[in-house]
Regions:
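Glycoside hydrolase catalytic-domain context in secreted enzymes
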Residues: 1-388
Length: 388
């Protein structure tokens, strides 16, 4: 078995600059400084020069990347680990992982016809990285921190072997709360430092009036995830519960919109590393589910057809209950906001107003595709600059 990438990492410390880490990617030394050869030119180009801003480097890099490499940045897919941590969902459909030379990655293609996502045909991990150029994957398994770090390092090593180095962003739902493992909602628990569920955390904050509970919670998450190389979370739920029958109530911070907003005022900078975006030691967040998933019809969830409608039962309830926590997400520059899978119902809702006091047209389109809510409310009036 080949030596794992974790055991082959070389580090170059720049004085008053970043540490450059690599397994096999070329490192350029110039004027006593080290630069990773990201674009493969072998020069301190605008892409490779860490002294420039991220925006300047990205602008230069997009001119170099091929069309296929750019397309690969658009997609996100569930991904799997090697044989030590087989996916129960895929195993139930007959998939048998085949280890790569490190033993960490699954090199067996996936072909399943009966899954929560319908039919799935996925390539080997190497082909996903080197031929499809996919750089965003969701991890649902629950490995030890050591195994997780090894797995992520092995993925990053694969990206180093491409002509143009674009690192892999591995995402996960939250991992630091006690609870039952539920696919797509609470994927992993009991391995990282474990706090009560989010309802319990909110109750503790409300009962003790100690918001520093959130500061410690967020700092723990940031340090643990960053240490493993897990740099993005599909978390946390800013939804305000207005129907206790909702299946996903367990993942929220409860029914008090002011408390939820205060929690997110501390949670986002604590996890991302500050209020001005994600820091190098931070973990980026996807706050969900705009414009609030708590407005359920009969408690049904929009992962299923029966829960497709958001119902605003009283005048102004959108602004009063569901929007406040998302104001905090925008104040503290959450990297991304996830719209919910539902759509608003004008027929079943009381009138709602935007921030200018104008009636909101409740068009029956999914929120991710709803121009009124995404372009008009979230970006236009609330000023969100990240991605949805």
């Amino acid at each position: 078995m080949a030596v794992k990438a974790s055991e082959r990492v070389k580090r170059y410390q720049n004085p008053n600059g970043p540490t450059i880490s690599t397994v096999e990617r070329k490192v350029i030394e110039q004027d006593g400084l080290y630069f990773k050869d990201i674009d493969g030119t072998g020069t301190v180009s605008a892409v490779n020069d860490w002294r420039l801003t991220p925006a300047e480097r990205a602008e230069a890099y997009v001119k170099v990347l091929t069309t296929s490499e750019k397309i690969g940045q658009i997609f996100t897919s569930d991904w799997r680990m090697g044989p030590k941590y087989p996916s129960p969902r895929l195993a139930a459909n007959g998939h048998k992982p085949v280890a790569d030379e490190s033993g960490l990655l699954d090199e067996a293609p996936v072909n399943v016809s009966d899954s929560i996502f319908g039919s799935q045909s996925l390539p080997s991990t190497s082909d996903m990285v080197k031929k499809s150029f996919n750089r965003h994957v969701i991890l649902r398994e629950s490995p030890t921190p050591e195994d997780l770090a090894d797995y992520l390092n092995q993925l990053q090593y694969l990206t180093e072997t491409c002509d143009h180095f674009v690192p892999m962003q591995v995402m996960s739902n939250s991992r630091n709360e006690n609870g039952e493992v539920v696919f797509g909602m609470n994927d992993a628990t009991g391995v990282f430092a474990t706090y009560p569920g989010t309802l319990g955390i909110a109750a503790a904050v409300k009962g003790t009036a100690r918001i520093d509970i959130i500061d410690k919670f967020a700092d723990t998450i940031r340090r643990e995830w960053n240490a493993c190389g897990l740099k993005k979370g599909y978390m946390y739920m800013a939804d305000c519960v207005t129907d206790p029958r909702w299946q996903r109530t367990f993942g929220t911070f409860g029914e008090d919109p002011e408390l939820i907003e205060e929690i997110f005022d501390h949670l986002i900078p604590g996890i991302q590393g500050g209020s001005n975006g994600v820091t190098p030691e931070g973990v980026s967040m996807t706050v969900k589910h705009f414009p609030g998933g708590g407005a359920r019809e009969n408690g049904f969830d929009p992962h299923y057809a029966a829960g497709q409608w958001n119902i605003y039962a009283t005048p102004g309830s959108l602004q009063k209950y569901h929007i406040p926590a998302f104001r905090a997400a925008i104040r503290h520059n959450a990297e991304s906001i996830m719209p919910y899978y539902s759509k608003p119902s004008a027929e079943k809702s009381a009138p709602q107003e935007d921030f200018n006091g104008n009636p909101i047209e409740l068009q029956p389109y999914g929120f991710a595709y709803n121009k009124v809510f995404i372009d008009g409310l979230l970006r236009g009036q609330m000023g969100f600059k990240g991605y949805a």
